[in-house]
């Protein structure tokens, strides 16, 4: 894609090349280039300058180029009008390499929840079960217990001996599970009851002491993650079946009202602050110290999911109008959409930020596609992750090495991310 130059003169353009990645910096002097220069030609220019400077990375790295903070030169993007009289400042960044398909984890029913932790993948399904897999694709456990589809899963803790995780279901309960890694056995140690309709989303806080759930009953509830008795459950931990039969239950630490329709997504900003999305067209930020709503962002469409990034402080949302939207909760103009991302052709069901790259997020939609985005490129995703044969219901990027997605084709697709923590290959 070429820069479009407006003005009487044609032919040459004065360009300053800048980068925030100091290891790839070139001399800060104006360069004279053709007005219709392409991304490929700019890559040759930058790599030639790096080679002339004796940079060992010269020729090994491909770059993308940004004008006014957005990618103007990539495929599918519209041309920008640039005045010939101006010296153009063009930022270049290392191009994110394409994720590679690694595995397809086949389940017995729709996969509606997925979350990775270290080398393990936890999934929740419409056949009411949870499943544990290794990131190499080996199935370890099928876990029955719920009596309706599982809509959310979250890891609480994991070490070499024991794992603790929770699941949220349309059966109105949240179950807290303890997994003996060596014996590969799992036990439901707490059943959390209090919601009056199906539970649609769940998330644990950063210190893993509490978890939050959102439901079709419009309520946000906060629970203890302590596997021991307490939080409303005074009975010693027994087997899952005994607990269900006897009706013993952990009660919530807190119930917060404010939404008018289903709470579709919940994330912790810090241990005292949460953000939720809802079908009622609002995003609400909650302060647990105040026991209520701190602020609110209103949209004109239902929100099916949201993701909050601790790296950049921004919120990305998924909606049924096929679009993703970016919000800054700290902005005085927080109700205004900072950007809208176009590319899906059906409802967008799920969205997740990268936990190690402040610019990247993934989305999954009813068009069977998972897309990888750079928030500086709103007109098109940087990659499409192909594989699902039916609707994508959930996606996850908790482990920076793997992008995961679950769908109504009964599968979890595993894509290996080339760049992990700190640019590690």
Curated annotation (Swiss-Prot):
Sorted UniProt keywords: Nucleus, Repeat, Ribosome biogenesis, rRNA processing, WD repeat
Name of the molecule in the record: Ribosome biogenesis protein WDR12 homolog
Organism this protein belongs to: Culex quinquefasciatus
Family of the protein in this entry: Belongs to the WD repeat WDR12/YTM1 family.
CDD domains recorded: WD40 (cd00200)
Segments of this protein annotated with the region Disordered: 227-247
Repeat region (WD), residues: 106-143, 145-187, 194-233, 258-296, 298-337, 343-383, 387-425
Pfam families per UniProt: NLE (PF08154), WD40 (PF00400)
Tagged with keyword rRNA processing: yes
Job description of the protein: Required for maturation of ribosomal RNAs and formation of the large ribosomal subunit.
Cystine crosslinks: none
Top-rank lineage group of the source organism: Eukaryota
Cross-referenced SUPFAM superfamilies: WD40 repeat-like
Any one Gene Ontology BP term: maturation of LSU-rRNA from tricistronic rRNA transcript (SSU-rRNA, 5.8S rRNA, LSU-rRNA)
MF terms in GO: ribonucleoprotein complex binding
